[in-house]
Amino acid sequence: MIRTLNIAHRGFSGMYPENTMEAFKKAVEIGSDGIETDLHITKDGVIVICHDETIDRTTDGSGFIKDYTYRELTEFNAGHGEKIPSLDELMDYMKDKNLLLNLELKNDVIPYENLERSTIDKIYEYGLKKNVIVSSFNHNSMQKVKKYDSSIKTGLLYGSPIHNPGEYAKRIGADALHPLFSLVMDKATINDIKRNGILINVYTVNEKSYMKKLIDLGVDGIITNYPNLLKDVIEKLTDK
Ligand code: G3P
Ligand code: MG
């Protein structure tokens, strides 16, 4: 029995415009176990979904999200005629599905003042506490989340090596580590993290050979642009 969770990175972003409702719905339709997505705050305090701090790369507009109102942002095309979604739209879609929702707070470049508090309020509003894991490259922010509510699950993102990651995560009170997958490709590292009681969700794994290796190593979740490929890999390993 393979228990590795299949988490769609920015939705099914390998085939549909990233971080759009289309990409989220396609991920759910093909049977992903969860969705990873990225959060920012508009000028008028609305949490919206986009990877970058600006809308230049992913829409037909330009400029910083923090300088637009939500209403203004909805005028832009995020691909296939899709709009930049609000967190409300995604949560409304997810609220009756028992799937994982990984909300990455994009507060490592712009320190959006109320992103933690506002995200937690949305989690309560939609009754999604048991489904959500909040993550960030900003580990101070994850400690702030725990101060507001210690029962909200948190994950520490990192893209370069850290010393004793399992012990570190435990010490600062996180539930999970979310490493760049190449940083945990050995059994000793995985075992060390698990010994500390910390979950491991790796990003971003788009090749089947790496998916197989990471499943074999026993990671808890794989974040991928191609949940269809990961589904294939899991099904084939299950058939054996
Ligand atoms: O949460 C995993 C992954 O999304 C972190 O990196 O830059 O794709 O948001 P990024
Ligand atoms: Mg992300």
Regions found by a protein language model. Give the residues of each.
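Phosphate-group recognition and catalysis centered on beta-loop-alpha active-site segments
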Residues: M1-K240
